[in-house]
């Protein structure tokens, strides 16, 4: 939203608006379906949610840690945050493609509602994979800054994912004695084990998939498959429900 007033390309501006709407819909979908699913199994997510809220509402706020940014640095701070989002969008595009192409989940009869929610989200991540990157470049983001931002963001995000998973695993009575934590080898070993069963992407594979983003010639349009994403969205119950809600909201407005 903060970047919209600086966008001079109308198509990009429309893409950014669509991106914002999609992310808002994802947030609502996850907060309702995922929380209900986990709550029914005695899993609490408040700690993970508070961490994310602190990260985005305090650390990455217009006024980080409540401190007003000097006027000369405001544009650079905006670009830095856009670069961060662009990096994350590449990572989620990779995971989106993994979710769309993983057949093992179907073979083991994974919960169909949750599976659809994950693939719907993944398909839309693939679909809008270029928006944040294009916006970053449009507003003057350079390669060197993108490179160093990605070098920080990639391990940070992977660490946050593992930390969140550890918090959830720690609430499972089966793993109580393990005391899961991001800094403990057990969590990473379990991730590798799950990846060998094709239940999760291999950690090393996931890291290698980030390497194209570090290239000066990186082009998000060449990553992922819009056709595969759109094909899933066309038949996804979650996507159709979200579309109906959006249409009703538009009519009501």
Describe each region flagged by the PLM.
Residues 1-253:
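Non-heme di-metal
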């Amino acid at each position: 939203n903060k970047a919209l007033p600086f966008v001079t390309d109308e198509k990009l501006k429309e893409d950014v608006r669509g991106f914002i709407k999609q992310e808002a819909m994802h947030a609502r979908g996850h907060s309702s379906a995922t929380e209900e699913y986990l709550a029914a199994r005695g899993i609490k997510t408040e700690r993970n949610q508070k961490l994310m809220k602190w990260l985005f509402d305090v650390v990455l706020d217009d006024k980080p840690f409540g401190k007003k940014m000097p006027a000369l640095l405001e544009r650079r701070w905006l670009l830095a945050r856009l670069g961060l989002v662009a990096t994350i969008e590449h990572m989620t595009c990779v995971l989106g493609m993994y979710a769309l192409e993983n057949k093992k989940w179907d073979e083991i009869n994974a919960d169909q509602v949750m599976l659809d929610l994950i693939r719907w989200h993944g398909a839309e991540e693939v679909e809008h994979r270029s928006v944040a990157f294009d916006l970053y470049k449009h507003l003057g983001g350079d390669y060197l800054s993108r490179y160093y931002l990605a070098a920080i963001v990639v391990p940070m995000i992977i660490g946050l994912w593992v930390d969140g998973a550890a918090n959830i695993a720690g609430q499972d009575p089966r793993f109580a004695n393990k005391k899961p934590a991001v800094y403990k080898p057990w969590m990473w070993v379990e991730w590798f084990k799950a990846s060998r069963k094709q239940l999760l992407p291999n950690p090393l594979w996931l890291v290698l998939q980030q390497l194209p983003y570090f290239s000066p010639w990186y082009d998000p349009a060449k990553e992922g498959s819009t056709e595969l994403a759109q094909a899933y969205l066309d038949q996804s119950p979650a996507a159709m429900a979200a579309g109906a809600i959006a249409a009703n909201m538009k009519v009501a407005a």
